[in-house]
């Protein structure tokens, strides 16, 4: 039975046209060489980005003008297969002995024709953070020493829309922004004492005080709010998202940073997982059969009150075209003066109000489920980019309603003894649109039970099975699931991270 499950997964992946010719490039590129800077910004679609598999030169056979994650190690032929909407071959890193950190599993597949290329991007890195105080007064870095810093593990999924530029840029630079934000915290995070209230104005100067010698909590006011090390890391991640979004705004014209992207990022640092989500990608932990949600979707429905409050406070953002109020359906002119159900930014329930002329405007939030939209345009309310997004046939900008700040949840790995079958699953909405949490947990149990606990390929096989299960198989009426419902026609990207980590006997 176990062998049949393995062979079935292998057959499905190979029949989809998975690349068999991959380049022999070594392990992941190191992400610690330089901070975010102008020279690291996205290049045009015809140039090769530094942290992506880039487009080959034009040949008589074909021209490929898109990129996939470096760790896939795709050859030019593999890039063409990955870009094939008809075959929709599942792509995973090659089994060459150099695996992703923590034996992480990864799989992806292109959409069924929704966009020209796969607009998802992914990143998996081990990043070293050196304290700013380890630099001399002249700014020259001393010899790196792990006594001066620490490493964090990093995974990121970026689901692009209206083009792949924002997702590609975020996949190459967001972890660098996070590293920059953590540089101020190296000594503080190593110190068991509570964080200081203030930092010195010029870190790294001779004679600068240690973290415990900085401004005393009692020297300013009392009592002081309790600030934990966790909250400092969360703040660093939040600021990094904001700085990444600002960089996209500055450089969107010169570097063709088109569209926007949802971002789902995981950091492993000092024994804890930090899961940051801005968009409609999701993460869950499957632990001993238990499902632990580690994120939530940010859509016009889930953030209705935040959007309505902004529209209420700044009506100029709505122009004369939209109303911040929500009605069960579009108000008709013949209903002027009647009392109709509505709700505003302060309400979770419904009430009646007299319909006025302003209520005839289009609602700021409309639709339900996957069809919910902000200003009749976009179905996500958090993410990076979208600085040029405007309402159709209008000059109204939608960006003010879109937040770049993620929600960050923390999971302490030291509080539970994890077994080889305990995993963190990250997926773009292409997975979750057709697969619920229970189905993912069932797939985790089915696939992992067919492999030995110390087999590192089991997590890649699981990622492939999740992608295949969401994609379905081609039939006369499109891609179909076993129950004959439509499979996902979107790009699908999945990370499977074993929670045992690098120190476990099976990683």
From Swiss-Prot:
**Top-level class of the enzyme under EC nomenclature:** hydrolase
Q: Which cysteines are joined by disulfide bonds?
A: none
Location of the PPM-type phosphatase domain = 103-499
| Comp. bias (Polar residues) | 59-73
The cross-references to InterPro entries, in alphabetical order and at most eight, read: PP2C, PPM-type-like_dom_sf, PPM-type_phosphatase-like_dom
For this UniProt record, give its keywords in alphabetical order, as a comma-separated list: Hydrolase, Phosphoprotein, Protein phosphatase
Modified sites of kind Phosphoserine: 65, 75
GO MF, one term, reads: protein serine/threonine phosphatase activity
Entry's Gene3D superfamilies? PPM-type phosphatase domain (3.60.40.10)
Disordered: annotated segments: 1-102, 197-220
Quaternary structure note: Interacts with UBE2I/UBC9.
Descriptive protein name: Protein phosphatase 1J
- Which organism does this record belong to? Mus musculus
């Amino acid at each position: 039975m176990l062998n049949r499950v393995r062979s079935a997964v292998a057959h499905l992946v190979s029949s989809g046209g998975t690349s068999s010719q991959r380049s022999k490039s070594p392990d992941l590129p190191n992400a610690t060489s330089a901070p975010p800077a102008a020279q690291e910004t996205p290049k045009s679609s015809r140039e090769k980005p530094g942290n992506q598999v880039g487009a080959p030169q034009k040949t008589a056979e074909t021209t490929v003008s898109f990129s996939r994650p470096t760790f896939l190690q795709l050859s030019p032929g593999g890039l063409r297969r990955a870009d094939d909407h008809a075959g929709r071959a599942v792509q995973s890193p090659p089994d060459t002995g150099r695996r992703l950190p923590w034996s992480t599993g990864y799989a992806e597949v292109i959409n069924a024709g929704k966009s020209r290329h796969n607009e998802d991007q992914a990143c998996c890195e081990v990043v070293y953070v050196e304290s700013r105080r380890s630099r001399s007064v002249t700014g020259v870095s001393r010899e790196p020493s792990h006594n001066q810093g620490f490493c964090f593990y990093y995974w990121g999924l970026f689901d692009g829309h209206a083009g792949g530029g924002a997702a590609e840029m975020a996949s190459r630079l967001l972890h660098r922004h996070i590293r920059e934000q953590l540089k101020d915290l190296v000594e503080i995070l190593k110190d068991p004492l509570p964080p200081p209230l203030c930092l010195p104005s010029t870190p790294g100067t001779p004679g600068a005080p240690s973290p415990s010698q900085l401004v005393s909590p009692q020297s300013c006011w009392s009592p002081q709010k309790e600030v934990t090390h966790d909250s400092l890391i969360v703040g660093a991640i939040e600021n990094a998202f904001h700085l990444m979004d600002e960089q996209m705004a500055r450089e969107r014209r010169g570097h063709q940073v088109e569209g926007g992207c949802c971002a789902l990022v995981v950091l492993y640092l000092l024994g804890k997982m930090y899961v940051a989500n801005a968009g409609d990608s999701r993460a869950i932990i499957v632990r001993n059969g238990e499902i632990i949600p580690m994120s939530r979707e940010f859509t016009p429905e889930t953030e209705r009150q935040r959007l309505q409050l902004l529209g209420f406070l700044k009506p100029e953002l709505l122009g004369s075209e939209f109303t911040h109020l929500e009605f069960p359906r579009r108000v008709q002119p013949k209903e002027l003066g009647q009392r109709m159900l509505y709700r505003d930014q302060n309400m979770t329930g419904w009430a009646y109000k007299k319909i006025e002329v302003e209520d005839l405007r289009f609602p700021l939030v409309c639709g339900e489920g996957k069809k919910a939209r902000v200003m009749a345009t976009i179905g996500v309310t958090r993410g990076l980019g979208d600085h040029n997004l405007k309402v159709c046939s209008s000059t109204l900008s939608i960006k003010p309603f879109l937040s770049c700040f993620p929600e960050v949840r923390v999971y302490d790995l030291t509080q539970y003894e994890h077994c080889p079958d305990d995993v963190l699953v990250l997926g773009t909405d292409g997975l979750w649109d057709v697969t619920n949490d229970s189905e993912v947990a069932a797939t985790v149990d089915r696939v992992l039970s067919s492999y030995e606990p110390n087999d590192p390929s089991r997590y890649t096989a699981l990622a492939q099975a999740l992608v295949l299960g969401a994609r379905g198989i081609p039939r006369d009426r499109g891609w179909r699931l076993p129950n004959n419902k439509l499979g996902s026609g979107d790009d699908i990207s999945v990370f499977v991270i074993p929670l045992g980590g690098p120190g476990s006997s099976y990683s």
